[in-house]
């Protein structure tokens, strides 16, 4: 009998991706101080990949420790722009500043997923996507932030590709699901391999 999957997140888009893929799950937000952890890892010169992976594992472990027998999925996404990690914008001015830094340039999104069982990691994957933004005007970016602030305030890089943010981009190299914050294809393969999803 398949074990229950718990998504250690309150991310609506991740929950929707799992539901749309037919993966039965519940959600339970794992509260960790992400900025403090990022700062500590950056001080140790950890790579963006390792930072995303560590945060995803911490979230999965936190819920897994409380739910024996369940498989718990933790996720995290970081944005690397020329060696600088961008976080979720603190306000609309910060969102505009982030978008201005990203325009007419490339950046990388790293989406980590870790599954823990009984407090121990049993599977992990970090998906990588490279994106290039158009050379959009300040006026367009200001209007974009004003129109979309409620939606983009919780998005690294201050955009959502599944919404109007797609108009900002000229090229995307990588998996769409990874851009949305979950390497879904790899996760589905793992769940099928362990017998938790029929194939």
Swiss-Prot record:
According to the UniProt record, one GO cellular component term is: cytoplasm
The record's top EC class is hydrolase
Which Gene Ontology MF annotations are present?
nucleoside triphosphate diphosphatase activity
A GO BP term here is: nucleotide metabolic process
Keywords of this entry: Cytoplasm, Hydrolase, Nucleotide metabolism
Co-factor requirement: a divalent metal cation
Tell me the domain of life. Bacteria
Q: Where in the cell is it found?
A: Cytoplasm
Catalytic residues (UniProt): 76
| Keyword Ribosomal protein in record | no
Q: What is its main location?
A: cytoplasm
Q: Is NAD given among the entry's keywords?
A: no
Recorded catalytic activity of this chain's protein: a ribonucleoside 5'-triphosphate + H2O = a ribonucleoside 5'-phosphate + diphosphate + H(+); a 2'-deoxyribonucleoside 5'-triphosphate + H2O = a 2'-deoxyribonucleoside 5'-phosphate + diphosphate + H(+)
Which EC numbers characterise this protein's activity in its record?
A: 3.6.1.9
The record's Gene3D superfamilies line, in alphabetical order, gives: 3.90.950.10
Q: Which Pfam families match?
A: Maf (PF02545)
Similarity remark? Belongs to the Maf family.
PANTHER family from the xrefs? BIFUNCTIONAL DTTP/UTP PYROPHOSPHATASE/METHYLTRANSFERASE PROTEIN-RELATED, BIFUNCTIONAL DTTP_UTP PYROPHOSPHATASE_METHYLTRANSFERASE PROTEIN-RELATED
State what this protein does.
Nucleoside triphosphate pyrophosphatase. May have a dual role in cell division arrest and in preventing the incorporation of modified nucleotides into cellular nucleic acids.
Protein name (database record): Nucleoside triphosphate pyrophosphatase
Question: In which organism is this protein found?
Answer: Roseobacter denitrificans (strain ATCC 33942 / OCh 114)
């Amino acid at each position: 009998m398949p074990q229950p999957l718990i998504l250690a997140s309150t991310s609506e888009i991740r929950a929707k991706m799992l539901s749309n893929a037919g993966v039965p799950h519940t959600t339970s937000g794992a509260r960790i101080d992400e900025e403090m952890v990022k700062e500590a890892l950056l001080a140790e010169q950890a790579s963006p990949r390792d930072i995303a992976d560590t945060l995803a594992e911490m979230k999965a472990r936190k819920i897994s420790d409380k739910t024996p027998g369940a498989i718990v999925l933790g996720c995290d996404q970081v944005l690397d722009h020329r060696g600088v990690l961008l976080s979720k914008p603190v306000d609309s001015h910060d969102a505009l500043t982030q978008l201005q830094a990203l325009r007419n340039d490339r950046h990388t999104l790293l989406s980590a997923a870790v599954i823990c069982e009984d407090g121990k990691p049993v599977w992990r994957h970090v998906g990588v996507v490279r994106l290039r933004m158009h050379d959009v005007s300040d006026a367009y970016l200001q209007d974009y932030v004003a129109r979309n602030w409620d939606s983009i305030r919780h998005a690294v890089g201050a955009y959502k590709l599944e919404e109007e943010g797609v108009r900002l981009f000229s090229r995307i190299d990588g998996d769409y699901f990874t851009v949305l914050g979950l390497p879904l294809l790899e996760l589905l393969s793992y769940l099928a391999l362990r017998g938790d999803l029929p194939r």
